[in-house]
From Swiss-Prot:
Protein role: Promotes RNA polymerase assembly. Latches the N- and C-terminal regions of the beta' subunit thereby facilitating its interaction with the beta and alpha subunits.
Name by which UniProt lists this protein: DNA-directed RNA polymerase subunit omega
Family listed: Belongs to the RNA polymerase subunit omega family.
Taxonomic lineage: Bacteria, Bacillati, Bacillota, Clostridia, Thermoanaerobacterales
GO cellular component, one term: DNA-directed RNA polymerase complex
Keywords: DNA-directed RNA polymerase, Nucleotidyltransferase, Transcription, Transferase
Enzyme class (EC, first level): transferase
Catalysed reactions, as listed in the record: RNA(n) + a ribonucleoside 5'-triphosphate = RNA(n+1) + diphosphate
Keyword Transferase: yes
Subunit structure: The RNAP catalytic core consists of 2 alpha, 1 beta, 1 beta' and 1 omega subunit. When a sigma factor is associated with the core the holoenzyme is formed, which can initiate transcription.
Gene name as annotated: rpoZ
Organism domain of life: Bacteria
Organism the protein comes from: Carboxydothermus hydrogenoformans (strain ATCC BAA-161 / DSM 6008 / Z-2901)
Length: 69
């Protein structure tokens, strides 16, 4: 199965950096044993995470950063 296009994925995040971080965190969860929200599409956790993001099965929430004093 092909990767979701970057155009589709960028509509799900406010920046490429956010997309990379969200994908990496989800891939780590899958590697740690959390089940995928999709049928078996790949053995690669990053590929699974990208498909989950592309299909709106997972989202991210930006936390407010605390200001350094």
């Amino acid at each position: 199965m092909n990767q979701p296009s970057l155009d589709i994925l960028m509509k799900k995040a406010d920046s490429r950096y956010t997309l990379v971080v969200a994908t990496a965190k989800r891939a780590r969860q899958i590697t740690a044993g959390e089940s995928s929200k999709l049928k078996h599409i790949s053995n690669k956790p990053v590929t699974i995470a990208l498909h989950e993001i592309g299909n709106d099965l997972i989202t991210y929430q930006r936390l407010k950063s605390s200001q350094n004093k």
